[in-house]
Amino acid sequence: VYAILAPAIAGQFQDMKNTKIRGAFQALGFTDVREVAIGADLCTVEEAKDFLEEVPEKLPFMATSCCPSWSMMAKKLFPEQAKCISMALTPMVLTARLIKQKEPDCKIVFVGPCAAKKLEASRKSIRSYVDFVLTFEEVAGMFDAKGVDWKDIPEGEPLFRASADGRGFAVSGGVAQAVVHAVKRIDPERVVKVVNAEGLLNCKKMLQMAKAGKYNGYLMEG
């Protein structure tokens, strides 16, 4: 059973060091842990390629797809703009798929800040990759119930191996920033205009502006 950890794991638990994360989750019974930021790096490259190929020739703008709440809201309330939502798999799914390609019979538990990931993982197309989803709050309860004290966990191999851009997915605007950096690596001359919003109400307003043509050519993050 593998725990795959969202980039937002950093700073979630008192006395947590990245050299102790693996040992702490193994104390809960997990075989090992992987960082979802690795999947974020893969997602970044895919979205950068899509942006270069699609915008503005085929699509007026492109919106990132990593947040299920944002993606579902956009597709439900603005169906005519649904084609502008990136089709890239989320970092959670990409990370889980990497592990299951090597160990098909293993179980994958995603650990992150957002309960909406439970809904994403319940989709038929994703169930074969992600078996369970736990929030940080739920994992904190497991640490308490198991009596795991971070201070007592021995130092081990550092967990974080993904790029700074991949880990930056946890920060507002971090997804778009990572995609912009990837676009620049592919096409240094390409100028990428970015707009982002926090909270579903602000995301809705942003999509209304996009529908009105205010963000043509933009990379959008919700």
Task: State the predicted function of each range.
Residues 1-222:
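Iron-sulfur-associated redox domains of electron-transfer enzymes in respiratory
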